[in-house]
Amino acid sequence: MYDVSTRKRALALVAQGRSLNSVSRETGISRAAMRSWHARLEPLPRMAVPPPGPPTDEVSYSYLLGLYLGDGCISAHPRGPGHYLRVACANSWPGLIDACEAAMRSVNPSGNAYRVQAQGYVSVVGYYPHWPHLFPQHGPGKKHERRIALAPWQQAIVDAHPWEFIRGLIHSDGCRITNWATRLVGGERKRYEYPRYFFTNLSGDIIRLFTTTLDHVGVDWRQANPRNISIARKASVALMDTHVGPKH
């Protein structure tokens, strides 16, 4: 189903004297569709896809929102209506790829999601006409170069499901690592290991969304520099291990 502006552009090309074959090759629109638009330009009401309300699967949405803010983007279909949501996932984490695809299928009203292999990573892709309604943070340019804020209905979902949001952000732009140190005990040097979580993002707004949600669930954090958050206290790492865990 094509929106009215797409239909008008196609018919304008035909009005320039071009053949239906020529316009069809350029736009990907069938000749039959263009012929039908001469009789009726407006789409039938039953064919129109209405903008969605808030997603019903809030758990999956909160996780997918975190993934989108970290490694996701939305782009318009090059020749027709609708948009693609893409989330880049490293090949190293097949479990993350599975979780991303499952969340996208659940959130997408059409249930559509598939994978595109690239060098070193997989793009999980879903097509849907109204992705920008579900992710109003979409806009021109890079996320860290524009303001990022949650809509009230998004904030309500994150407040209800904070750990899923944190997990999505960690899975996209975070990691769990193990540091170590040595000390002398009774004249013998012993090695001690301790895990910690890191989150890195160039957007100060996304950093604040992350740390505000950490505060909400009682996780202590430290800002090492403007784009890095460290979680190292034992109790907080234990909380993160319970609800997030390492990528796999």
Model-derived regions: residue spans:
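Internal intein/HINT superfamily modules and their associated LAGLIDADG
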Residues: 1-248
